[in-house]
Amino acid sequence: MKKILIAVIAALTLTGCSLTEPIPVRGEVVSCADIKTVASSGSVLDCLDGSEGLAVESIVGPALINVWGTWCAPCRQELPHLAHYLGTKNPVQVIGIAVEEKNTASVKKFVETHGMTWPILYDASGSTRSQFGMGVPVTWFVDASGTVVYKKYGPFKSVEEIQLNVIKYLGVK
């Protein structure tokens, strides 16, 4: 009996350590106007808030471009980590690209109810599929010159993972 109790306590402790903290804020649809860009001839994506769209190729960093979908369970799992990372007041901009969505209204509702506070581009036509590939989530690390220096496939498991990758690939602490 004592061994079972110890095993249960250990399991609960380990489970508690792996749980993601709740997202600290209510989400909001954010303007794309503050995204750092340069002139580009790429295909323009709409901004979720209705402000002027932009081409993915025009984004300069340091930046994380996170491709996701409301229907994607791993994407939802990494959202709290991205939200907490933004809460650290870091100098790296985070930009989301919502893909394979039925309409902007459902994406806006998702953003607001899931604590997302970063600009979201909307890929209604699937034009980024050839750039980012078929699977999501995928996050591109873009340096100050606009060069993609690393592609992270799959969800972030912690805010520390994001921070370590930002230091490693973008040189930003």
Question: Language-model segments: which ranges?
Answer:
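N-terminal targeting signals for export/organelle localization
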Residues: 1-46, 161-164, 168, 172-173
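A short beta-strand-turn-helix
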Residues: 42-63
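Short pre-active-site segment immediately N-terminal to redox-active cysteine/selenocysteine motifs
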Residues: 61-63, 68-71, 135
